[in-house]
Each structure stands twice: as structure tokens, then as C-alpha cells.
């Protein structure tokens, strides 16, 4: 919850961060994207390290790094310092999350008991994603944006003091003795280059040499990643598993879901504070209905999954999310319509949670016990890469519309609307993906994926 919460608790503080540290243009989104990139890029590597060296050990080490990076980020005096601290935070989170998830799956037996535990895990992730906006607003208003990072330190210290007592060590004696560092490096750097190309294209030009060369470099690095994984004795991400239809489609849906959630929160933060002029506290409180929708929808999603199956439940969630985002985009205005915007937010968030819980269950539901750690790592990696892509893409859309428009308030509102239209389109694509390709994949009523 702490690692997921930190993704969004910083989002509400972005306008304050931008003003105080002097971020220019679309650079401020790297405060979010940098965290997600290092987090997502190292998840599988850290998961493998946990199997090899001990999950409790990785959990403790990751939490310690996370706390130290939070302290450093809170003391940041320049944009690059904050981005660097967020990158380091992502490293800590990458060690923390797969270790906690592996400890969870090792604790609970298979079947319904494990499904319930995974459902709670998915629900906590979704609730943390929304709750961070509220807490971020309160903290930024009364204590300043630096405290959205400082607050992690006492929480981490408390958990670190209890971990040796309440958490039993767990590791896989069959885990490989080598770590695929080349795979982790090429995947992370490749995606970083692609995201940089997209995020900076509105300023450099979509066909500028910088954009083209950066995108080409990212493509080459991702191609090298595939080659490395095919030849590695102990690959970071075994391609035969990722090539299974069920695993591939589910994680593709997770990426799209995360893009939608990240884009929505980014746009609404700018709308409330930059377009409407609300304070961080007021903006944070406007996310309370959305958070309430998460809390209510989480158990409902579990019930629907038991009744309808994962695919049908997730598909309904994406349909509801798309409808809610269309509602919000249609009502954005600097002169009113706030109630309609809030209602659309509630609808979109309810749909998000209804999609999130079954996808979390499905992502680890059809692999063997010896593959659950990998499947959990792939799920978390897909989530973080989706977040990074969502922030970069929506920032690029907003910037492109603003650059092509007359400027001022109308250009900002137009960019925000297009950002939400883009998020709604991504949700619709996820819906189509599930309908067309999952077939019996995650449609099993009380089971996970069945890859043809």
C-alpha cells in the first residue's frame, strides 16, 4: 500500500512542486514517470533476487532504500535532485513489492483462499491509488509538498522495526544463482527512451532528429532485450510464459488499465488546481467521492468476479470507466459543472476498481506454483509501465494541444479534455481486447487464465 500510495500522493502536489523548484514545460511529469520507470524496470530482477536471497531480506532492504530516498526527495533543492530521488524510490519499491506479494502467495493456500488474498491485494492497490490524492492534498496544504515524501519515513521505520518479528523468511531453494542484469538494463532503458521521445515530442517536434533518434534508440534497446531473453540461461522474463495468450492479454489489459488511471489523475489534478484555482487541500478533498467509490466497488468487484468470471467482470469495468471519462471530459469547464465532473469521476473510478480486482486475480491464476513469483512480478511491472506510459502520453497530448492553440485558459481546458478523451479511448481499447482475445482465457467462473 505504501509503494502504491506514493505513486499518487505526489500527484496532487505537482503544481506546488513545479512552482517551487522551477520545473519547465512538461518536465514535472518526470517526478511521476521516473519513479514508475525504475519501479517497473527492476521489479522482475528484484523478484528474482528475493527468490534467491530471501524475500524478507529484500522486503527490509527495499523499505530501507525507499525511506532514505523519501528523505532525500523531501530535501530536494533542484528539479534533478527530486527526479533522482524518485528514481531511487522506485528502486526501493521494486524490491519491496514483489517480495511482499511473494510472501503473500506463500502464506495462503491455493484456490478460493488465495483468490481472496489476491483480491484484497488488488483492492488495496486500487484504494491506495485513489486515497493518495486525498492525503496528498491535506499534507501539501498544511505541511507543504515536501511532507508527501517525508511522511514515508516514520511509517517505514515502524514497519522495519516489526518485520524481523512478524515476517518469516521465505525463499526458493531452486532459484537460479545468476541475475539477468542485461535484461533489466535493456528493458528499462528502452522504455525510458520511448517515453522520453513521446513526452518531449510536443516541444522538440514529432519528426525532429531528437525525437526520431530517441525513439529509434528505444526500439533498438527493446529489440536487444528480446534477444537477450532468448539467449539467457536464466532469463529475467521467460518468453514462453509471456507468450501464452492468457498471460499476454491479461498483462496488456493491465498496462492499458494503468495508463487510464494515471492519465485520469494527472488531468484532474491540473484541472482542479491550474484551471479552477483550487488549493491542494480543496483539490484533494474533491477526490474524496472517488476514493469512496474505490472502497465500495472493491468488494463488489470480488462478488462479480465469483459470479461472472474475471473476463466478464473486467470488461464491464472498462466499459463503465470509459463512460465515466467521457462524462468528465464533456463537463470540464472553468465556469461550472463541478457536480457533473465529480459524478463522472465516481463512475470512472468504480469501473476502474471493477476491472482492477479481477485482472489482479487473473494475472496469477493460471500459472504453476513455481511460476507465481514471476507472474506476480510481471503483473507489477505491467502496472508501473502502464503508469509511466499514461503520464507521458497524457502530458504529451496536453502539451501538443496547448502548443497548437491560442494559449491561455481555453488552451489548457482543451488540452485537458483531449487528455480525458484519450484515456477513455484507451479504456475502450482494453474492453475490445478482452472481448476479442480472452475467449475462455479469464472467463472461467472461479478460475484464472487458460491459455490456448
Residue ranges of each PLM-predicted region?
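12-transmembrane solute porter fold
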Residues: 1-12, 31, 209-221, 234-404, ...
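Transmembrane-helix bundle of Major Facilitator Superfamily
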Residues: 1-165, 300, 308, 319, ...
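Cytoplasmic-side transmembrane-helix entry/capping segments in multi-pass membrane proteins
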Residues: 61, 113-125, 176-186, 211, ...
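Transmembrane alpha-helical core positions of polytopic small-molecule transporters
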Residues: 61, 94, 129, 187, ...
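Hydrophobic transmembrane-helix bundles of small-molecule transporters
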Residues: 119, 141-254, 260, 278, ...
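Interfacial helix-cap and linker-helix signal at transmembrane-aqueous boundaries
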Residues: 17-18, 49-50, 135-143, 198, ...
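Short helix-kink/termination motifs in transmembrane helices of multi-pass secondary transporters
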Residues: 2-13, 38-41, 55, 148, ...
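A residue-level signal for alpha-helical anchor/packing sites in multi-pass solute transporters
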Residues: 103, 107, 138, 162, ...
Amino acid at each position: 500500500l505504501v509503494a502504491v500510495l506514493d505513486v499518487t500522493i505526489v500527484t496532487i502536489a505537482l503544481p506546488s512542486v513545479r512552482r517551487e523548484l522551477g520545473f519547465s514545460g512538461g518536465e514535472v511529469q518526470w517526478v511521476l514517470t521516473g519513479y514508475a520507470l525504475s519501479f517497473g524496470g527492476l521489479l522482475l530482477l528484484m523478484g528474482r533476487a528475493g527468490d534467491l536471497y530471501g524475500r524478507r531480506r529484500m522486503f527490509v532492504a527495499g523499505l530501507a532504500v525507499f525511506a532514505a530516498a523519501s528523505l532525500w526527495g523531501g530535501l530536494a533543492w533542484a528539479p534533478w535532485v527530486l527526479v533522482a530521488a524518485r528514481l531511487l524510490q522506485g528502486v526501493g519499491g521494486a524490491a519491496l513489492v514483489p517480495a511482499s506479494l511473494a510472501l503473500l502467495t506463500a502464506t495462503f493456500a491455493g484456490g478460493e483462499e488465495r483468490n481472496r488474498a489476491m483480491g484484497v491485494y488488488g483492492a488495496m492497490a486500487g484504494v491506495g491509488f485513489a486515497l493518495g490524492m486525498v492525503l496528498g492534498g491535506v499534507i501539501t496544504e498544511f505541511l507543504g509538498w515536501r511532507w508527501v515524501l517525508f511522511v514515508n519515513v516514520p511509517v517505514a521505520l515502524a514497519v522495519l522495526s516489526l518485520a524481523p518479528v512478524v515476517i518469516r523468511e521465505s525463499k526458493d531453494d531452486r532459484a537460479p544463482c545468476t541475475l539477468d542484469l542485461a535484461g533489466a538494463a535493456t528493458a528499462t532503458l528502452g522504455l525510458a527512451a520511448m517515453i522520453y521521445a513521446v513526452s518531449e515530442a510536443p516541444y522538440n517536434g514529432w519528426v525532429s532528429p531528437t525525437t526520431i533518434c530517441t525513439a529509434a534508440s528505444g526500439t533498438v534497446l527493446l529489440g536487444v532485450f528480446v534477444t537477450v531473453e532468448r539467449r539467457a540461461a536464466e532469463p529475467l522474463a521467460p518468453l514462453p510464459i509471456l507468450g501464452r495468450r492468457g498471460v499476454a492479454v491479461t498483462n496488456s489489459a493491465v498496462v492499458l488499465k494503468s495508463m487510464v488511471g494515471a492519465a485520469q489523475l494527472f488531468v484532474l489534478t491540473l484541472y482542479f488546481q491550474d484551471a479552477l484555482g483550487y488549493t491542494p487541500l480543496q483539490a484533494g478533498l474533491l477526490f474524496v467521492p472517488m476514493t469512496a467509490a474505490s472502497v465500495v466497488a472493491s468488494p463488489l468487484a470480488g462478488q462479480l468476479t465469483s459470479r461472472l468470471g474475471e473476463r466478464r467482470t473486467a470488461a464491464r469495468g472498462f466499459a463503465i470507466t470509459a463512460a465515466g471519462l467521457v462524462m468528465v471530459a464533456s463537463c470540464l469547464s472553468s465556469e461550472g459543472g463541478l457536480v457533473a465532473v465529480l459524478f463522472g469521476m465516481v463512475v470512472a473510478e468504480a469501473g476502474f476498481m471493477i476491472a482492477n480486482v479481477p485482472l489482479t486475480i487473473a494475472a496469477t491464476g493460471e500459472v504453476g506454483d513455481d511460476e507465481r513469483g514471476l507472474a506476480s512480478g510481471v503483473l507489477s511491472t505491467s502496472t508501473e509501465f502502464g503508469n509511466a506510459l499514461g503520464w507521458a502520453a497524457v502530458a504529451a497530448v496536453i502539451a501538443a494541444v496547448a502548443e497548437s492553440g491560442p494559449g491561455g485558459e481555453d488552451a489548457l481546458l482543451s488540452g485537458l479534455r483531449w487528455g480525458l478523451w484519450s484515456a477513455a479511448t484507451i479504456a475502450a481499447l482494453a474492453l475490445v481486447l478482452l472481448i476479442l482475445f480472452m475467449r475462455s482465457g479469464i472467463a472461467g467462473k472461479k478460475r484464472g487464465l487458460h491459455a490456448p
